[in-house]
């Protein structure tokens, strides 16, 4: 039997060589491989193939290995590739990406992907599946952020804070062992993975180690607490001892030292640099040069990406609010103006496109928007395609660019903070934190968000309707968000020292606990598809940015995709 590509795509979703548009962007991904055996596709429904004795094995039990969940015929967009496959989930983890079904009557079925009577089905035909996002720059200012992040497709939040305290509104620190304990307790209620950063600003290691032993997954150095060379050195030494990450927001006004002094204090040790673009803070005007170094893992945040005609005006007022500044004080106004530089903000987009900035993150409620990491990442990708054209290695599709950009908010932040053994990609063995998208809504509004293999958020219609689809349809909480289900579908990340110190037992934590690990030997070469290290220079007078001698300049845009048309109602 033969059918046209169009007919096949309508029935079973795209196959090898077919292209899918991402939302209303100009980005098109092409399926590189299809794991399906043509004619043996797994489809659920009346008269379809997942029935007893057909695609569903009638003998296998859950104990024998039958899947708990199969997502059928999905296009998977991951840093590892763009493929069409079934995804098998067992005990909340991905056990296979390939061909599911009944090996009694089918060839090529993955032995770990057998469908049985105990298997639930999510139809992925015509859908895109991505890994849940990992946001590494969270100010934990209000718990409602969790709902917004999860609804956007982000399933892991890392950062610091204790609520709308003045310190937390400005810095991503959960300061001290007592607050660390209380935030770990609060995290029990959230159907999302979390990890908390302690305050790293101390010239002695003792108060830093105390926070790590209380469960902090890392330490945050912030200029508002004094990112001095002595504090940096002590923090780096504590991190080396505990195998944790350090995130740094450097000294904007160069009060305790210049960029070179910070580099000397860091040495050759790995560190995650927030706000590599400088608008969110950091050595003015040349913080961007840090993206040249092998031990620097750079990220930037949603406020400045992509560069638009409104970016500059928006930032000055945001700066005043977020960093407890006063518009009546000339020095505070000068402080704000020193950060907001059009030339460096423009260069940020290009550095993302060449893979020199490795990660994107939100800076939630502290200049950034927690629900827009994914949207803005893809807006940058679209802007760069329109302004810079295809990337090397692309032939009629945008696969190289798509894989580079999705890595920025999935695998790379997971690697940076020692979580990649659990989350960050659609790979065997990882927690089934998966996001299903209708291609027309890609990047904006997920259809389903799975946590640990269970649906936590979904586009759902009127609960009193006779079917699930009548209006109003919007993102609603699902069963993984209720009761004790979230304890078995979400992870609280913790330092190895905190786990060894018995923190989960002392606090009576019921959520899954996982240690961060394998951090201190990382380098930028570990940043998937985003490991470029050009020689970056910034003109101190004009703020022009150069990479390997080439000026990085682009124009602001007045229109972005994935924007207003999706939020009319």
Curated annotation (Swiss-Prot):
Q: Which residues get modified to N6-carboxylysine?
A: 220
Q: Which CDD domains match?
A: Urease_alpha
Q: According to the UniProt record, which cysteines are disulfide-bonded?
A: none
Q: Which residues bind Ni(2+) 2?
A: 220, 249, 275
Q: What keywords appear on the UniProt entry?
A: Cytoplasm, Hydrolase, Metal-binding, Nickel
Q: Name one Pfam family in it.
A: Urease_alpha
Q: Where does Ni(2+) 1 bind?
A: 137, 139, 220, 363
Pathway of action: Nitrogen metabolism; urea degradation; CO(2) and NH(3) from urea (urease route): step 1/1
In the Enzyme Commission scheme, what number(s) does this protein have? Answer: 3.5.1.5
> PROSITE patterns under this entry?
UREASE_1, UREASE_2, UREASE_3
Q: Which GO terms describe its molecular function?
A: nickel cation binding; urease activity
Which InterPro entries does its entry note?
Answer: Amidohydro-rel, Metal-dep_hydrolase_composite, Metal_Hydrolase, Urease_alpha_N_dom, Urease_alpha_subunit, Urease_AS, Urease_asu, Urease_asu_c
Determine the domain of life of the protein's source: Bacteria
Name what cofactor the protein needs: Ni cation
Q: Where in the cell is it found?
A: Cytoplasm
* Biological process terms in GO annotation: urea catabolic process
Q: Where does substrate bind?
A: 222
The record ties this protein, via Gene3D superfamilies, to: Metal-dependent hydrolases, Urease, subunit C, domain 1
Q: Which residues form the active site?
A: 323 (proton donor)
Q: Which reaction does it catalyse?
A: urea + 2 H2O + H(+) = hydrogencarbonate + 2 NH4(+)
Ranges where the Urease domain occurs: 132-569
Describe the protein's quaternary organization and the partners it interacts with: Heterotrimer of UreA (gamma), UreB (beta) and UreC (alpha) subunits. Three heterotrimers associate to form the active enzyme.
Q: Per its record, how is this protein called by name?
A: Urease subunit alpha
Organism in which the protein naturally occurs:
Bacillus velezensis (strain DSM 23117 / BGSC 10A6 / LMG 26770 / FZB42)
Q: Which gene encodes it?
A: ureC
């Amino acid at each position: 039997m033969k059918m046209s590509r169009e007919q096949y795509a309508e029935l079973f979703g795209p196959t090898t060589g077919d292209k899918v548009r991402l939302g209303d962007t100009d980005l098109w991904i092409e399926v590189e491989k299809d794991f399906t055996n043509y004619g043996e596709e797994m489809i659920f429904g009346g008269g379809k193939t997942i029935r007893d004795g057909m695609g569903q094995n009638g003998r296998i039990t859950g104990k024998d290995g039958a899947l708990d969940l199969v997502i059928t015929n999905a296009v998977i967009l991951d840093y590892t590739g763009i493929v069409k496959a079934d995804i098998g989930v067992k005990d909340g983890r991905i056990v296979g990406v390939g061909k599911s079904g009944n090996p009694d009557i089918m060839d090529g079925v993955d032995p770990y992907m057998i469908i049985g009577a105990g298997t639930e089905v999510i139809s992925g035909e015509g859908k895109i599946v991505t890994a849940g996002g990992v946001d590494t720059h969270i100010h934990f200012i209000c718990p409602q952020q969790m709902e917004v992040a999860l609804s956007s497709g982000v399933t892991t939040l890392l950062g610091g804070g204790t609520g709308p305290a003045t310190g937390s509104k400005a810095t991503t620190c959960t300061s001290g062992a007592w607050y660390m304990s209380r935030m770990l307790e609060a995290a029990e209620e959230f159907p999302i993975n979390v990890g908390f950063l302690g305050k790293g600003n101390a010239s002695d290691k003792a108060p830093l180690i105390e926070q790590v032993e209380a469960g902090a997954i890392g330490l945050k150095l912030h200029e508002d607490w004094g990112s001095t060379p002595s504090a940096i050195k002590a923090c780096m030494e504590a991190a080396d001892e505990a195998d944790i990450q350090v995130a740094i927001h450097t000294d904007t006004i160069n009060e305790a030292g210049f960029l070179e002094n910070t580099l000397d204090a860091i040495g050759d040790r790995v560190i995650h640099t927030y706000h590599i673009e400088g608008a969110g803070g950091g050595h003015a005007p040349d913080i961007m040069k840090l993206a040249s170094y092998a031990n620097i893992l750079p990220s930037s945040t949603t406020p400045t990406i992509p560069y638009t005609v409104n970016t500059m005006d928006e930032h000055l007022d945001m700066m005043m609010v977020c960093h407890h500044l006063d518009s009546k004080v000339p020095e505070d106004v000068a402080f704000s103006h020193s950060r907001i530089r059009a030339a460096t903000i423009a260069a940020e987009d290009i550095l993302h496109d060449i893979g020199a900035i490795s990660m994107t993150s939100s800076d939630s409620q502290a200049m950034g928007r927690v629900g827009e990491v994914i949207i803005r990442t893809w807006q940058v990708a679209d802007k760069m395609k329109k302004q810079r054209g295809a990337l090397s290695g692309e032939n009629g599709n945008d696969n190289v660019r798509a894989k580079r950009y999705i890595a920025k908010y999935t695998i790379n932040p997971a690697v940076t903070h020692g979580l990649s053994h659990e989350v960050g990609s659609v790979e065997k063995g990882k927690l089934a934190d998966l996001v299903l998208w209708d291609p027309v809504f890609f990047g904006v509004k997920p259809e389903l968000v799975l946590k640990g293999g269970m649906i936590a958020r979904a586009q759902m219609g009127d609960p009193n309707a006779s079917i699930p689809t009548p209006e109003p349809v919007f993102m609603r909480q699902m069963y993984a968000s209720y009761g004790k289900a979230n304890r078995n579908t979400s992870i609280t990340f913790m330092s190895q020292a905190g786990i060894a110190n018995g923190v989960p037992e002392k606090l009576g934590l019921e959520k899954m606990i996982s240690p961060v690990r394998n951090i201190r030997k990382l380098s930028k070469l570990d940043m998937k598809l985003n490991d470029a290290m050009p020689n970056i220079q910034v003109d101190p007078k004009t703020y022009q940015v150069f990479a390997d001698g080439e000026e990085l300049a682009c124009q602001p845009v007045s229109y972005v995709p994935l924007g207003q048309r999706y939020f009319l109602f």
